[in-house]
Amino acid sequence: MQKPEWLRVKAPQRERIGAVADLLLDLKLNTVCQEASCPNIGECFAGGTATFLIMGPGCTRACPYCDIDFDKSVRELDPTEPERLGEATQRLGLKHVVITSVNRDDLADGGASQFVACIEQIRRRSPGTTIELLVPDFCGDWDALAAVMAGAPDVLNHNIETVPRLYKKARPQAIYERSLELLQRVRQGWPRCYSKSGLMVGLGETDAEVIEVLADLRRHAVDIVTIGQYLSPGPKHLPVDRFVSPEQFEQFRSQGESELGFLQVVSTPLTRSSYHAGEVQRLMQEHPR
């Protein structure tokens, strides 16, 4: 299936992204921008921002839509990773940093302690930086979630990814209701934290199902949602079922904000979980907690 014109992006210029890429290489840090082949890497790197991928790059799950490598081997966490991440945040002068991780189902706490260590190092090196975490479901271990939230992130993101009908195909190791419960627990237990989720379209869902998911997310007290076009990483991954028009993405945004009451819905073909994540600082000023 040929990509429509609105999904064509210019290849990033080496000189525009080189400084960020070189720094990440120097500090031996992974980014989801690189590991997941994000189409916005040129724009984000050129703006001096990145979404850090910790505890990776290998993931203990093999979701058929994802471009991150599968690795079921048990690996020790790198105790120097949080300090290196804090240094990168300081050297890049980031005002808002996003930290995500691969799934680490091999760890007793799912990697919660590493998230907290990263928060502590960023706050030590760059106290004015707001912090967003994009976390896995921790296999429903709510003690692990509580451990992460004890670090007091400004934003907690957990992606719902797709509509419930497609979970067996796209997220066979995840449970739709469990993801909703995680998001609701964040808002109920830590009401000052802004909650966020995201989903892809183009996997076989209908527009009506997308709206139903948005309604579910709002009922579970989610504040911010991202919606973007699924792009298959390769022939071994799930194929694209459809390309959603920019007009329909705008309709999702409009309904989500005006009818369902989200603080923000970022919905464009090239939107990804952390795309324009720094805008959350404006939302925090407009809707203080």
Curated annotation (Swiss-Prot):
GO molecular function: 4 iron, 4 sulfur cluster binding; lipoate synthase activity; metal ion binding
Keyword S-adenosyl-L-methionine set for record: yes
Annotated Gene Ontology cellular component terms: cytoplasm
Enzyme Commission identifier(s): 2.8.1.8
Keyword Metal-binding: yes
CDD domains in alphabetical order: Radical_SAM
SUPFAM superfamilies linked: Radical SAM enzymes
Compartments reported by the entry: Cytoplasm
Catalytic activity: [[Fe-S] cluster scaffold protein carrying a second [4Fe-4S](2+) cluster] + N(6)-octanoyl-L-lysyl-[protein] + 2 oxidized [2Fe-2S]-[ferredoxin] + 2 S-adenosyl-L-methionine + 4 H(+) = [[Fe-S] cluster scaffold protein] + N(6)-[(R)-dihydrolipoyl]-L-lysyl-[protein] + 4 Fe(3+) + 2 hydrogen sulfide + 2 5'-deoxyadenosine + 2 L-methionine + 2 reduced [2Fe-2S]-[ferredoxin]
InterPro entries: Aldolase_TIM (IPR013785), Elp3/MiaA/NifB-like_rSAM (IPR006638), Lipoyl_synth (IPR003698), rSAM (IPR007197)
Membrane-crossing segments per the record: none
Major location category of this protein: cytoplasm
Enzyme class: transferase
Residues given in the record as [4Fe-4S] cluster 2 binding sites: C59, C63, C66
Pathway(s) it belongs to: Protein modification; protein lipoylation via endogenous pathway; protein N(6)-(lipoyl)lysine from octanoyl-[acyl-carrier-protein]: step 2/2
Keywords: 4Fe-4S, Cytoplasm, Iron, Iron-sulfur, Metal-binding, S-adenosyl-L-methionine, Transferase
Cofactors required: [4Fe-4S] cluster
Cofactor binding note of this UniProt entry: Binds 2 [4Fe-4S] clusters per subunit. One cluster is coordinated with 3 cysteines and an exchangeable S-adenosyl-L-methionine.
Residue ranges of domain Radical SAM core in the record: 45-263
Annotated [4Fe-4S] cluster 1 binding sites: C33, C38, C44, S274
Alphabetized PANTHER family for the sequence: LIPOYL SYNTHASE, LIPOYL SYNTHASE, MITOCHONDRIAL
Family from the record: Belongs to the radical SAM superfamily. Lipoyl synthase family.
NCBIfam families per record: lipA (TIGR00510), PRK05481.1 (NF004019), PRK12928.1 (NF009544)
UniProt name for this protein: Lipoyl synthase
Originating organism: Synechococcus sp. (strain RCC307)
Lineage, highest ranks first: Bacteria, Bacillati, Cyanobacteriota, Cyanophyceae, Synechococcales
Gene that specifies this protein: lipA
